[in-house]
């Protein structure tokens, strides 16, 4: 793995703080600079000390690969629609933020003065730092160690979704989360309809405020809205 540009800027105090964070994460970094970058918000990045945005980008893909492969192998009797629905909940912003908070990552996250820091970090930032830590572990120790970290922290979300799937209303869950954390009510927009009348497939996106999220597909508008949620 390539060394990060942080090597000469970490102080003894920085290293002590990172080692404490490692205990929360349950992983010892060979290169603690990767963890330092994962914990740095763009509001305080410098040329020498980059933010975690690139790691977050990588972590999102690593997380998606690991969870997709796990669900594919674990639930061999489930179709693509079921697997997609399970995955959408397990790797949702709410789930990642929950795990980030449980691990105490917000206490180690470096943010600038302009970033709102209420009692806890905003949910989106908590989820982002979880993804960045996933990428840092992947860069430091490879895919298998990243896989262990992901499944150790998210496996119970898989069980929760499966055990309660027949009772879950994804639109209701999204609405509760959006109203509580973002003070907005989700809306849904049909972006495409395909197929003959007896085999229609609808593609719907969820909209929260001004942000449009990934689409969901279903055989009815309601099913597509549930998938999008």
Residue ranges of model-derived segments:
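Double-stranded RNA-binding/processing signature
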Residues: 1-229
């Amino acid at each position: 793995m390539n060394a990060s540009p942080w090597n000469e800027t970490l102080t003894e105090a920085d290293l002590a703080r990172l080692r404490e964070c490692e205990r929360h994460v349950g992983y010892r970094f060979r290169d603690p600079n990767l963890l330092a970058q994962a914990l740095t918000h763009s509001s305080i990045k410098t040329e020498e000390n980059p933010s975690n945005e690139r790691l977050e980008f990588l972590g999102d893909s690593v997380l998606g690969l690991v969870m997709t492969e796990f669900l594919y192998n674990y639930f061999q009797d489930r179709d693509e629609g079921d697997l997609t629905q399970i995955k959408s909940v397990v790797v949702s912003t709410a789930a990642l933020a929950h795990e980030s908070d449980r691990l105490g990552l917000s206490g180690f996250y470096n943010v600038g003065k302009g970033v709102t820091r209420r009692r806890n970090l905003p949910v989106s930032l908590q989820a982002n730092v979880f993804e960045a830590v996933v990428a840092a572990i992947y860069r430091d120790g490879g895919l298998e160690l990243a896989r262990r970290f992901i499944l150790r922290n998210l496996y119970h979300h898989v069980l929760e979704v499966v055990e309660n799937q027949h009772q879950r209303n994804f639109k209701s869950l999204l609405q509760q989360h959006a109203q509580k954390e973002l003070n907005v009510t989700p809306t849904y927009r049909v972006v495409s309809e395909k197929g003959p009348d007896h085999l229609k497939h609808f593609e719907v996106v969820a909209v929260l405020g001004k942000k449009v999220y990934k689409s969901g597909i279903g055989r009815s508008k309601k099913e597509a809205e549930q998938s999008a949620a």
